[in-house]
Amino acid sequence: KLDIVLSVRKLQQKNQSSGVKKILYDVRKEGDKAVIKYEKKFSKNNKIKPSKKEIYNAIKSLDKKVIKAIDLAFNRIEKFHKLQKVSNIKFIDSYNNKIEYRHLPLKSVGIYVPANLPSSLLMNVIPAKIAGVKRIVLANPRTNGKLNSAIMYVAKKCGIKEIINVGGAQAIASLAYIQKVDKIVGPGNDFVAKAKQKVFGQVGTEGMIAGPSEVTIIADSKSDVNQISTSMAAQSEHGINSQSILISKNKNVLIKCDLFLKNILKKFSNKKTISESINKNGLLIYAKNDNQIIQAVNIISPEHLEILSKNTNRFKNKIYNAGSIGI
């Protein structure tokens, strides 16, 4: 039954993106005029490029604790991705035939970042900078007409010169047809994912299109309810089609998390998005045993899996359908 529930949800999401083709066509034909038209329609936004003063004021208003957290994340992400840098290969055989394999950076990349996710920008722009990409364009929508201070700080820290305040399918269309970047990366809702699928071939995209974010959490009686609820809320704020699932053999954990999540929603500025996402795509699953938990996770195939259990070994070597596993 679980796979049927998930399939129905995905089908409903696909039906919502039928207007993407029209948006792409209009932007390709009319340029910024069409971009502004759709921004006004969907976001009440009529300003698609921020001024230097706006960026300065946004960064100036940023909490020092947030700056410290971003700086910490930047250094850690940079250190990790520097380890991924590959070397060129050169081979010469006994007849002096030369074969060379060279790694060259793309000339330009467009990074789509949902309204309030500075971490997504960090995790996309840092590898691009390390690879040697010279031109990076950021597409990041405004929220209620305002820039996101944290994202503007990351953009400045990483040396991004081109920023468009555009979201949804119109942002992908702009990156592909107006900014004309070589490749588009970054997470987004179903409209963004569908737009990236349709422009692929005219512009590069990730090998696996980054659609709505999703997390599945395995918890037991010793798990921290606050940590579980915060993780679910963090994924749900990505968009209304994000999926958050909690699996446990302990009914009390499921009940406590449900109540705790409802209470902490009041503290979030974007509680409307989180609440709608959880109501549409949240799921609490009671499992009778470990095998049922493992089976459920392998059916769900989550982007992110968190094993918040005392004994992780009984799960991690039997789960093969998960993008990343946090222990």
Task: Set out the residue ranges of the language-model regions.
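Glycine-rich phosphate/diphosphate-binding loop of Rossmann-like nucleotide-binding domains
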Residues: A131-K146, D220-S269
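C-terminal core of ALDH-fold dehydrogenases
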Residues: D290, N298-I327
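Short loop-to-beta-strand entry elements in the cores of soluble alpha/beta enzymes
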Residues: M208-A219, Q235-D258, I274-I285, P302-K310
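Conserved NAD(P)+-binding/catalytic subdomain of aldehyde/semialdehyde dehydrogenases
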Residues: G159-Q243
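Conserved small-residue-rich beta-alpha loop and adjacent elements
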Residues: F91-Y153
